[in-house]
């Protein structure tokens, strides 16, 4: 909170500022709102029917979750040069950021508790060994399959409603996890938690961009949300280890659920309501004053769309076919790679092959469908024209590979500490503390630097530093000790992911117009979620294959057996060497992917500009 309160908030001494519309022009030059592909996809057919009609200002009453007394929209004189509403106090702005970042923190805190406590949890709820990893897997699967759905729904009914609903459900079912008496209850509650967090993650982007104008406050809001993830996971690891050995693992979920309930109540009061219907994204009104044909048509589209009943808008203003097609493809991919990460022999199972084929076929189907939607001027989830923008396409590719590497790096590092160095889960969690501290500092510094430093150099330099993390772990030997090897890998690993989190949210949110920010958040989170699953699955296949070939068929087992929370005294030195060889191979694969990210961002962000600067 202290760091947030220190954000400068200078008054605009030069008079009224000119605020332009978010656009895919990343160098910061102004662009008309009609340049947004998402706006164009919805506009022309409806505009033909409504542009000639006189404006009906009676239709501009606030929606259900809008408040006439809420903070003004981020336009013109209502926003300070650093992006904070002049009608919003610093305390309230800090509470908004803390609330949104808090759920991001609790999301990964639960995963950290689960990672350390899973063996004890499985014993207490009598979870079958064949289902041991399902409490973790179903959470990711449920979230990955519904992120885009709730991003689209939040675009229509309002991000604040969807976010608060998700936060309330997350609080309730986190407590449910703590009260689970059977394995089936544990898996079911974790599934609902995945759906609940899918309501919060994409809409948090919309609440951030609509709640803060372009500038330092928006940058810091994204930075603190990024900081919440590593802090939450590491806190979960530490608390999970402590609680499991003392008062019991259930206490960790009770604490998490209680904090979440407080955040949900706080959100009702402090979160900004969406702009009024006739204001669009809050920045459109200034553009409309220019009275160009395009902006008049866009305004007419907005009035016509908002005047229809909610059910009609949900039915016609959401690309349901595209949403379901890409969500199913991501769900199939995530499921198969989740299964394969536990036992790569299951890749040959007929049902997994069928799901992979279905996922592969759905991708070109989705591309053809959204292309058709664009040609017919209908809503398209991710218009194909966006992929022709180097900043957008390279950012999505970087997010995919970065989250694939970072997720796999954390998991394999934990395996290395427990299975090769034979230390406890609590000792393992303490070895991740440098990652947490550096990650927190990186997010705060990035929130300031995105205003003044070219995004290309921020991302590329951080990628080069983080490149050394998997390289060190690919070479490390148990005899090195923690301080000569793994310590430096932990220090460097969060630099690039935490820089990219802030930068990518700023870039992707600029591609979508202000009314579609929930979709922007859904795109980012969906890409990162698939990256998590694919990265862990592929590294698991490589690790297990190398371990088996190293030791023949004589007893290595699966190199991806999950941490048990206890020291793993392996039966023989050859087995340890085989397992270590598998881990090294996985880290080499991560190194290759991280190097690819460096090249992608260097080439793709040449015209990235300063994405955090006030336009």
Curated annotation (Swiss-Prot):
Q: Which residues are glycosylated?
A: 25, 302
According to the record, the segments passing through the membrane are 94-114, 138-158, 162-182, 192-212, 222-242, 251-271, 320-340, 351-371, 397-417, 432-452, 455-475, 488-508, 522-542, 585-605
InterPro entries annotated for this entry?
MFS (IPR011701), MFS_dom (IPR020846), MFS_trans_sf (IPR036259)
Spell out the Polar residues composition-biased ranges: 16-53
Keyword annotations? Glycoprotein, Membrane, Transmembrane, Transmembrane helix, Transport
Keyword Signal included in the entry's annotation = no
Gene Ontology CC annotation, any one: membrane
> Example GO molecular function term?
transmembrane transporter activity
| Subcellular location(s) per record | Membrane
List the residue ranges of the region (Disordered). 1-85
* Topology with respect to the bilayer: Multi-pass membrane protein
Source organism, top-level taxon: Eukaryota
The record's listing under Pfam families reads: MFS_1
The record's listing under PANTHER family reads: MAJOR FACILITATOR SUPERFAMILY MULTIDRUG TRANSPORTER MFSC, TRANSPORTER, PUTATIVE (AFU_ORTHOLOGUE AFUA_8G06760)-RELATED
> Which family does the similarity line name?
Belongs to the major facilitator superfamily. EmrB family.
The function of this protein is:
MFS-type transporter; part of the gene cluster that mediates the biosynthesis of pyriculol and pyriculariol, two heptaketides that induce lesion formation upon application on rice leaves but are dispensable for pathogenicity. With the ABC transporter ABC7, is most likely responsible for pyriculol and pyriculariol secretion and thereby may contribute to intrinsic resistance.
Name of protein: MFS-type transporter 1
């Amino acid at each position: 909170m202290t760091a947030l309160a220190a954000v400068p908030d200078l008054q605009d001494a030069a008079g009224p500022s000119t605020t332009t519309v978010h656009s895919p022009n990343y160098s910061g030059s102004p662009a008309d709102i009609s340049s947004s592909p998402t706006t164009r996809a919805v506009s022309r057919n409806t505009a033909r029917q409504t542009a000639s009609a006189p404006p009906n200002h009676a239709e501009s009453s606030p929606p259900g979750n809008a408040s006439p007394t809420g903070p003004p929209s981020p336009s013109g004189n209502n926003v300070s040069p650093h992006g904070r509403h002049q009608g919003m106090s610093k305390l309230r702005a800090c509470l908004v950021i803390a609330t949104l970042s808090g759920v991001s923190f609790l999301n990964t805190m639960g995963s950290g508790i689960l990672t350390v406590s899973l063996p004890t949890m499985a014993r207490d709820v009598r979870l079958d060994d064949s289902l041991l990893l399902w409490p973790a897997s179903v959470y990711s699967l449920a979230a990955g399959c519904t992120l885009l759905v709730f991003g689209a729904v939040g675009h229509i009914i309002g991000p604040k409603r969807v976010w608060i609903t998700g936060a309330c459900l997350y609080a309730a079912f986190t407590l449910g996890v703590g009260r689970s008496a059977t394995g089936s209850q544990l898996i079911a509650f974790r599934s609902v938690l995945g759906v609940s967090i899918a309501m919060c993650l994409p809409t948090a982007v919309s609440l951030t961009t609509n709640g803060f104008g372009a500038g330092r406050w928006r940058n810091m809001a994204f930075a603190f949300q990024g900081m919440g993830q590593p802090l939450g996971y590491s806190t979960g690891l530490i608390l999970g280890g402590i609680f499991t050995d003392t008062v019991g693992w259930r206490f960790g979920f009770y604490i998490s659920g209680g904090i979440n309930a407080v955040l949900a109540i706080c959100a009702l009061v402090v979160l900004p309501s969406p702009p009024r219907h006739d204001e669009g994204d809050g920045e459109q009104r200034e553009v409309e004053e220019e009275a160009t044909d395009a902006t008049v048509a866009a305004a007419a589209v907005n009035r016509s769309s908002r005047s229809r009943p909610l059910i009609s808008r949900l039915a016609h203003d959401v690309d349901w076919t595209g949403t379901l097609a890409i969500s199913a493809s991501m769900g199939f991919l995530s499921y198969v790679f989740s299964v394969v990460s536990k036992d790569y022999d299951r890749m040959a199972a007929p049902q997994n092959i069928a799901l992979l084929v279905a996922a592969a076929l759905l991708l070109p189907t989705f591309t053809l469908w959204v292309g058709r939607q664009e040609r017919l001027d209908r809503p398209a989830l991710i218009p194909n024209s966006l992929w022709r923008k180097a900043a957008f396409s390279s950012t999505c590719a970087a997010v995919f590979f970065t989250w694939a590497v970072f997720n796999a790096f954390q998991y394999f590092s934990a395996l290395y500490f427990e299975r090769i160095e034979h230390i406890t889960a609590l000792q393992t969690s303490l070895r991740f503390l440098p990652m947490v501290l550096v990650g927190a500092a990186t997010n705060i510094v990035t929130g300031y630097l995105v205003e003044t430093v070219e995004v290309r150099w921020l991302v590329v330099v951080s990628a080069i530093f983080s490149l050394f993390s998997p390289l060190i772990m690919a070479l490390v030997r148990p005899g090195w000790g923690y301080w000569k090897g793994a310590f430096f890998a932990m220090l460097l690993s969060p630099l690039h992911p935490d820089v990219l989190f802030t930068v990518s949210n700023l870039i992707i949110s600029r591609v979508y117009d202000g009314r579609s920010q929930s979709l922007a958040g859904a795109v980012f989170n969906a890409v990162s979620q698939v990256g998590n699953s694919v990265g862990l699955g592929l590294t698991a296949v490589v690790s297990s294959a190398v371990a088996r070939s190293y030791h023949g068929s004589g007893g290595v087992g699966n190199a991806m057996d999950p941490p048990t929370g206890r020291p793993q005294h392996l039966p023989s030195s050859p087995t340890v060497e085989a397992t270590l060889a598998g881990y090294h191979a996985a880290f080499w694969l991560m190194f290759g992917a991280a190097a690819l990210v460096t090249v992608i961002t260097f080439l793709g962000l040449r015209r990235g500009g300063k994405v955090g600067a006030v336009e």
